[in-house]
């Protein structure tokens, strides 16, 4: 099994965080999230796919990952290119923004892979935050939009034996200031939390219909 992590260029990263974090801060947020993800991957070989040279260099030096320079725009195209350039058939696709994933999640996937053709974990917004394929061409990739349901439909249409891996920690992807709050609650001892704390970011509880907490930043 090999892990593929597709990563967007730094200048397009996490624009919904732009009012809360500068472009430079968003870059280092990403790099710290990648470190947390890599620490969960046990000894699995990892490939990072990106158009961004800085990300590719970081992946080589800091993550000990193989790298692929993305040729065409689009998440599906990037992953398909990785499929073409790697020899392994068993694939685990993980996004770059799920820093709460842990070793035991990966161990679960490895164990489940003995029994299923496809394993999929949804994001909170209906996307796909983890996708295992017994063979890399089992389904047509349908990332973007509500990809979780699209991938399930692909599996059903092809009569694949699949498993829905329903994990809150894996479902948390970081796109908005509110998402950062989950890092403070659930991300103890992560690189991501330590980085956010170094920026003066903190969380206050908020018991109302408007949410569980408020994410703030010290002046």
Swiss-Prot record:
Organism superkingdom: Archaea
InterPro entries given in the database record: CofC, Nucleotide-diphossugar_trans
Protein name: 2-phospho-L-lactate guanylyltransferase
A Pfam family this chain is assigned to: CofC
EC number(s) on file: 2.7.7.68
Protein's GO biological process: F420-0 metabolic process
Pathway membership: Cofactor biosynthesis; coenzyme F420 biosynthesis
Keywords, sorted A to Z: GTP-binding, Nucleotide-binding, Nucleotidyltransferase, Transferase
An annotated Gene Ontology molecular function: phospholactate guanylyltransferase activity
Catalytic reactions of this protein: (2S)-2-phospholactate + GTP + H(+) = (2S)-lactyl-2-diphospho-5'-guanosine + diphosphate
Membrane-traversing stretches: none
NCBIfam families: F420_cofC (TIGR03552)
Assembly with partners or alone: Homodimer.
Family: Belongs to the CofC family.
Protein's UniProt keywords contain Nucleotidyltransferase: yes
Main enzyme class: transferase
Purpose of the protein: Guanylyltransferase that catalyzes the activation of (2S)-2-phospholactate (2-PL) as (2S)-lactyl-2-diphospho-5'-guanosine, via the condensation of 2-PL with GTP. It is involved in the biosynthesis of coenzyme F420, a hydride carrier cofactor.
HAMAP family (UniProt xref): CofC
């Amino acid at each position: 099994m090999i892990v593929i992590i597709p990563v967007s260029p730094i200048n397009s990263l996490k624009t919904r965080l732009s009012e809360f974090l500068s472009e430079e801060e968003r870059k280092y947020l990403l790099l710290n999230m990648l470190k947390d993800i890599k620490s969960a991957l046990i000894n699995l070989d990892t490939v990072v796919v990106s158009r961004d040279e800085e990300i590719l260099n970081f992946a080589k030096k800091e993550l000990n990952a193989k790298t692929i320079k993305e040729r065409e725009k689009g998440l599906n195209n990037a992953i398909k290119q990785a499929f073409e350039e790697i020899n392994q058939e068993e694939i685990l696709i993980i996004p770059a923004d799920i820093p709460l994933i842990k070793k035991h999640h990966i161990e679960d996937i490895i164990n489940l892979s003995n029994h299923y053709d496809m394993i999929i974990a949804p994001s909170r917004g209906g996307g796909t935050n983890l996708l295992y394929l017994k063979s890399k061409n089992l389904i047509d990739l349908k990332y973007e939009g509500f990809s979780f349901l699209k991938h399930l439909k692909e599996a059903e249409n092809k009569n694949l034996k699949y498993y829905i891996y329903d994990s809150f920690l894996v479902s948390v992807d970081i796109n908005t200031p509110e998402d950062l709050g989950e890092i403070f609650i659930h991300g103890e001892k992560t690189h991501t939390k330590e980085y956010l704390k170094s920026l003066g970011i903190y969380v206050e509880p908020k018991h109302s219909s408007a949410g569980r907490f408020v994410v703030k930043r010290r002046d």
